[in-house]
């Protein structure tokens, strides 16, 4: 998981 975002779909959306 990325330390810049919490685990979850929101994290993936932020990376896109």
From Swiss-Prot:
Compartments, as annotated in UniProt: Secreted
The keyword Secreted belongs to this UniProt entry's keyword annotation: yes
InterPro entries for the chain: Tachy_Neuro_lke_CS
Secreted is among the record's keywords: yes
One GO location term (cellular component): extracellular region
Keywords assigned by UniProt, alphabetized: Amidation, Neuropeptide, Secreted
Biological role stated in the UniProt entry: Tachykinins are active peptides which excite neurons, evoke behavioral responses, are potent vasodilators and secretagogues, and contract (directly or indirectly) many smooth muscles.
Name this polypeptide is given: Des[Ser(1)Pro(2)] scyliorhinin-2
Residues modified as Methionine amide: 16
Species in which this protein is naturally found: Torpedo marmorata (Marbled electric ray)
Family the UniProt entry places it in: Belongs to the tachykinin family.
GO biological process: neuropeptide signaling pathway
